[in-house]
Amino acid sequence: PDDSVPTQLPSESMTTEATTPSQPANPQPVSQKPAQPTSQSVSQSNSQSVSQSTSQPSSQPTSQPINQADSMVGLKIAVAQQQFIVGDVINNAKKMVELAKDARDKGANIIVFPELSLLGYPPEDLLLRPSLASRVKLAFELLYTVKDIVMLVGYPHIDPNGTFNSVAIIHNGQQKGFYHKQCLPNYGVFDERRYFNTGHNQVLFDYQGLPIGLLICEDLWQDAPIRTLKEKGAEIIISLNASPFEQNKQEQRKALLKSRATEHNIPIVYANSVGGQDDLVFDGGSMVVNAQGKIVQEAPRFLQHTLYVVARHDAQSGQVILSEQRKSPLALSQIAETYQALVVGLRDYVNHSGFKG
């Protein structure tokens, strides 16, 4: 229930600070550039039309500028590898508010949350409840209280055309735009086609002249979405994910990100979920890969953690340069990662179920 306070994973006390911190849609592309260096803007462009009728608040894309007081010496992105409880929409939103404020105070310009983080993953038949839309609306009102940082929030978008696995672009009390997941997995533990409609809106949003492309999990495992974003001018990709643990899965993710980054010559920010939910365990391992396929930032496995990276546009090379972390987390052996998965899965099942003793 929304008024409960679920037991959370222990948070890692240390965050990886990057060096030199800075402080549905219309079918025709919208492009706005800031008029001066101190004006930061977000605008959205879509390749195809989607429904503009929705029960969610302020979900129609806009090109209203984002203005902030300080000029940007680098775009600082916070990757919130955190646990969000399935169905606990209001408390999930409250947690996002606190995380966003903390990231803003550390100089972040954007904070990225995992796939469907507002509702939790996998939500399954909760998506069929008529009350869901009103609960999401209340949660958005909480998110709108955060100022001076862009929030990329995974949420269920519900309108007369269906239910979509989406990401909202939120800033200063407004939803500036949204993106609907295009590739819905329907194999193994995934059953997304039962609940979600396929999205068709390729989304770029502009931040201080830097075109950012958005993807959600399975979109990255297929080549077409990232290829299209690159062709439309994206210079960095941000992907929201709820990728569950399997043995050797982290190595598969790393291989995928390196391949996508080098093939399309574009850096990728990969935000993953963490924690146990019923029969699934999410192992985190969020990371940032540069255009040459090098992992420049990596979060620890099985721990809540906020990762920071600074992206700067290099005038000479024309590429986005990413800050590198000073020390990578220790790699886990297959035995160690399996043990951690068992511990997290059992602990969170007991805690979420409210068992005593």
What residue spans do the PLM features occupy?
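Enzyme catalytic cores with a strong preference for nitrogen-chemistry domains
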Residues: P1-P10, M14-P34, S39, Q44, ...
